């Protein structure tokens, strides 16, 4: 029935700021919803249409299945008809789990594991030669090398790391006459087995034979080995139960030796028990590196974090884990050490010799030190080696159980590649299996572009048998690689952690996965898929969205990108303004129709009636002062030198993955911050030299991370406006008469807040088969404060009423109070006039959070010596909002500061004073400076992808 309907018909949508709107969305079309930031686009696309589609799907499942799924609340809409099953592909980062990678998300790594398990060839780490299976005769010869009189068990591993009760398997063994098993390391009689938990993994081995080695065994050993190998599909364990007394042997009691009819190196004895997909999984105990447990990283106590500021003396607290005011015991220990090695604890740490520093950090080895400890009238003298700061911290970390102390100790650790697996995450057994001379870790470390090229030539390197086995696997892998290439992610590697991806990258990965699934009849809802994408790659992304449509799906995209709007089959413009000024359908139709709607701000920009103007001249900066970063080599950077003129608006451009963030965030920002704030826990990328920091007093990274993680954080508290509002309420006559202090008007502490909801205004009710429900607190009616506090009013408004005001309303309300008004006007200047000043931080988008931070910086007293770094500040912004944002950023520069933006948006780039274009491509083919200069210089450079697209914006 749904398939025959022409439209998804939404009637009476009132979610958030939507004003009872009716809209028809054509099915099986590429539809763009546009409009100002905060106008209600996401409220319509995600909170109404997607939420209802998802809710209907989940409701159709059994109550058992529903308890594992999040059930959406019914959106505030009268009716939606013609709705298909809905899939949302939003901006949220895929996963913070370090085990989640690009390879696991896209399932390419799963196919790689299968490929290596089926056609990979194991090589001996000792000889470098291919290794082969063992025969029973070879196994007998190895066993006969054990000392005579050794007692052994021959074990057949029936179950290895699988869940279940295994009643049938145990019954079969009983019928075959076996009497003893080893279950999870414990020897058990087969008639007296413990009950196995079907939800836990188990190891079960059959004791096939118990043998004492001597010459009279005859064929018993070979027969028992064959029985064991048959039982366990070619694998058997030998366990040494007891060695004869007074016999020296290289073998040990309880040692296990694995025999396999499959793979073994006769020279080194290196063995592979199996070549199955699970040994290539870093999430399985059968494949994960035992040292790092499949993470690929180790965490070490770092000298630079233990003593972050070497300008401080030991006596004054240079050794941070031992406290800024070290205890008497520690000071006496360090004084004794100083007396022994003839150094002072009162001089800056930096002036100590390297030998003294090594002893302090690592200990005195076997050299004993005379320590004197005074306790009142008693003096205790001990002569022993000094353990060292790092070994002491390691011991504490190993033995302490307190989570809080462990978290505190973690502050002094830095991460490094695992020394056992070199960051590949896998056991040696997995890394010795190769295809075309590469192991699976090396293949996962290639960029998508390099991987596609490697697979295109792989067929030439496989024999006929391997090719026959691998044909279908290769097809699945190459298809998925092609989809990733098409969405502009050719620079990523399969081993890249999901948590390090930007919102745009993770969204495009999920988009590529959806195309790979080949579903049809689905409603896809996407949130700005063009974010983080260079103009060059935008065309490929749009073609991908159209391909999704051509599979028979409805593609609904919330988007501001002009090219995407032009390519859409149908456009819905929500507005006209943001917040309470939005929530209406202003215009509908194709791009030419949208241009003609006078009320549509989008239409004005599309038609050229309104534009972002190119500045008539560019700034040259402060007397040729500049920050110079030399020899940057972090990630893919190729020994890069850059010069950033101070007092300018500088844009860093380049295709996705070219090295912009590596250069600006991971190297420049972190290096400058480390210099200005030595105690900060940041690890800059490698570079040779950083000059010009004497010209700045602050460096600020205004990013899109949340301004708070609880409902109590809000724009008013973050910007400091709420502090002044509370101060104002305390000074009111009624407050003074009652003796109220500032804490009375805080919802974070006892006194004035409602204790029933602890100042949240909501009470969480846990449901079993349904999602948790938040209901308005019936004591304070959602106002957060108790009745006495709410009785204090200014101009007829309580403090709770003020928190419910929009920024615009609050500005009018407090226009005569400069301290509050100045904080609020900056929020309005960055285009956030529509948000409520008490709006929960958890409900703000990344772009809104970034602009709240920007507003906070604007409200500070400027020194004119600040360097601001913003990574894609146009994320989530309509072109009209970008126009407002540019005025704010240029205002910061006019105050003498330097603004550095990493940006793809050409309307922003064209207004820059100076541009640094990184590239020319992404990944290994990037990391170089293509061109630097004014927008005109960039546009004139033929090698610059940015310049090619910028040219038409400068006309």
UniProtKB/Swiss-Prot annotation:
One of its GO terms (biological process) is SOS response. Residues 322-601, 621-951 form the ABC transporter domain. Signal peptide: none annotated. InterPro entries: ABC_transporter-like_ATP-bd, ABC_transporter-like_CS, ATP_grasp_subdomain_1, P-loop_NTPase, UvrA, UvrA_DNA-bd, UvrA_inter. It comes from the Bacteria. Disulfide bonds: none annotated. A zinc finger (C4-type) spans 754-780. CDD domains: ABC_UvrA_I, ABC_UvrA_II. GO terms for cellular component: cytoplasm; excinuclease repair complex. Keywords: ATP-binding, Cytoplasm, DNA damage, DNA excision, DNA repair, DNA-binding, Excision nuclease, Metal-binding, Nucleotide-binding, Repeat, SOS response, Zinc, Zinc-finger. It is found in: Cytoplasm. PROSITE patterns: ABC_TRANSPORTER_1, ABC_TRANSPORTER_2. Belongs to the ABC transporter superfamily. UvrA family. This is UvrABC system protein A.
């Amino acid at each position: 029935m749904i398939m025959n309907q022409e439209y998804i018909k939404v009637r009476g949508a009132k979610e958030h700021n939507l004003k009872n709107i009716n809209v028809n969305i054509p099915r099986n079309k590429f539809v763009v919803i546009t409009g100002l930031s905060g106008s209600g686009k996401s409220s319509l696309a995600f909170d109404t249409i997607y939420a209802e589609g998802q809710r209907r799907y989940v409701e159709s499942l059994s109550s058992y299945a529903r308890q594992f799924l999040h059930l959406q609340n019914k959106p505030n809409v009268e009716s939606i008809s013609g709705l298909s099953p809905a899939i949302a592909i939003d901006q949220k980062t895929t996963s913070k789990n370090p085990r989640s990678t690009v390879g696991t998300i896209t399932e390419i790594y799963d196919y790689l594991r299968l490929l290596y398990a089926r056609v990979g060839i194991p090589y001996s780490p000792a000889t470098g030669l291919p290794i082969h299976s063992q025969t029973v005769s070879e196994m007998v010869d190895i066993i006969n090398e054990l000392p005579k009189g050794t007692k052994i068990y021959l074990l057949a591993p029936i179950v290895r790391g699988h869940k279940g009760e295994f009643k049938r398997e145990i019954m079969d063994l009983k019928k075959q006459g076996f009497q003893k098993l080893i279950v999870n390391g414990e020897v058990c009689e087969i008639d007296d087995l413990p009950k196995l938990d079907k939800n836990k993994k188990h190891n079960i081995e059959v004791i096939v034979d118990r043998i004492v080695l001597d010459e009279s065994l005859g064929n018993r050993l070979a027969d028992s080995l064959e029985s064991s190998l048959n039982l366990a599909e070619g694998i058997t364990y030998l366990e040494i139960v007891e060695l004869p007394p007074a016999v020296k042997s290289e073998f040990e009691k309880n040692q296990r030796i694995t025999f396999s009819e499959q793979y073994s190196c006769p020279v080194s004895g290196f063995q592979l028990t199996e070549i199955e997909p699970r040994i290539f999984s870093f999430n399985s105990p059968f494949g994960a590196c035992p040292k790092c447990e499949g993470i690929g990283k180790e965490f070490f106590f770092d000298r630079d974090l233990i003593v972050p500021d070497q300008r401080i003396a030991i006596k004054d607290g240079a050794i941070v884990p031992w406290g800024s005011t070290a205890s008497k015991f520690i000071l006496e220990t360090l004084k004794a050490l100083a007396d022994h090695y003839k150094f002072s604890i009162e001089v800056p740490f930096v002036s100590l010799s390297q030998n003294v520093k090594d002893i302090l950090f690592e200990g005195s080895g076997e050299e004993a030190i005379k320590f004197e400890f005074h306790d009142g009238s008693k003096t205790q003298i001990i002569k022993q080696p000094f353990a060292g700061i790092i070994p002491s911290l390691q011991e504490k970390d190993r033995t302490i159980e307190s989570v809080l102390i462990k978290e505190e100790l973690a502050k002094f650790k830095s991460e490094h590649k695992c020394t056992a697996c070199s960051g590949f995450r896998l056991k040696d057994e997995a890394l010795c299996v190769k295809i075309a001379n590469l192991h699976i870790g090396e293949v996962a470390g290639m960029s998508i572009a390099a991987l596609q090229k490697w697979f295109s030539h792989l067929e030439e390197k496989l024999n006929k048998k391997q090719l026959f086995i691998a044909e279908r696997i290769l097809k699945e892998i190459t298809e998925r690689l092609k989809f990733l290439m098409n969405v502009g992610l050719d620079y990523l590697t399969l081993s890249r952690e999901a948590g390090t991806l930007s919102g745009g990258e993770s969204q495009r990965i999920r988009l590529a996965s959806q195309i790979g699934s080949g579903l049809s009849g689905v409603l896809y809802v996407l949130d700005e898929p063009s974010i983080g994408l260079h103009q060059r790659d935008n065309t490929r992304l749009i073609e991908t969205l159209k391909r999704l449509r051509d599979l028979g799906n409805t593609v609904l995209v919330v988007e501001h990108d002009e090219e995407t709007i032009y390519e859409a089959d149908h456009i819905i413009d929500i507005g006209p303004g943001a917040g309470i000024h939005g929530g209406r359908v202003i215009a509908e139709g194709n791009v030419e129709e949208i241009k003609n709607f006078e009320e549509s701000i989008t239409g004005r920009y599309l038609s050229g009636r309104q534009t972002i103007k190119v500045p008539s001249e560019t700034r040259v900066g402060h007397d040729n002062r500049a920050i110079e970063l030399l020899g940057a080599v972090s990630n893919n950077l190729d020994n890069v030198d850059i010069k950033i003129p101070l007092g300018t608006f500088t844009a860093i451009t380049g295709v996705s993955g070219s090295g912009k963030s590596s250069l600006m965030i991971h190297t420049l920002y972190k290096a400058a911050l480390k210099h200005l704030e030595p105690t900060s826990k940041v690890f800059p990328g490698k570079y040779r030299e950083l000059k010009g920091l004497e010209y700045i007093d602050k460096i600020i990274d205004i990013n899109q991370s949340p301004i708070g993680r609880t409902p109590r954080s809000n724009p008013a508290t973050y910007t400091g406006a709420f502090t002044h509002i509370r101060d104002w309420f305390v000074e009111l006559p009624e407050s003074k008469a009652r003796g109220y202090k500032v804490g009375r008007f805080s919802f974070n502490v006892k006194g004035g807040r409602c204790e029933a909801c602890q100042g949240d205004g909501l009470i969480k009710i846990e449901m079993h088969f349904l999602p948790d429900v938040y209901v308005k607190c019936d004591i304070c009616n959602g106002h957060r404060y108790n009745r006495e506090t709410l009785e204090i009013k200014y101009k007829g408004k309580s403090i709770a009423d003020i928190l419910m005001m929009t920024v615009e309303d609050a500005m009018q309300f407090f226009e005569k109070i400069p301290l509050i008004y100045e904080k609020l006007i900056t929020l309005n200047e960055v285009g956030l006039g529509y948000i409520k000043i008490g709006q929960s931080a958890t409900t703000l988008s990344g772009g809104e959070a970034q602009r709240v931070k920007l507003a906070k910086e604007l409200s500070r007293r400027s020194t004119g010596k600040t360097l601001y770094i913003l990574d894609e500040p146009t994320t989530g912004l309509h072109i009209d909002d970008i126009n407002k944002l540019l005025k704010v950023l240029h205002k910061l520069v006019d105050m003498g500061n330097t603004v550095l933006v990493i940006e793809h948006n050409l309307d922003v780039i064209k207004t820059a004073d100076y541009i640094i274009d990184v590239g020319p491509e992404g990944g290994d083919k990037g990391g170089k400076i293509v061109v630097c200069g004014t927008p005109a210089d960039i546009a004139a450079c033929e090698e610059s992808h940015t310049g090619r697209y910028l040219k038409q914006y400068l006309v």
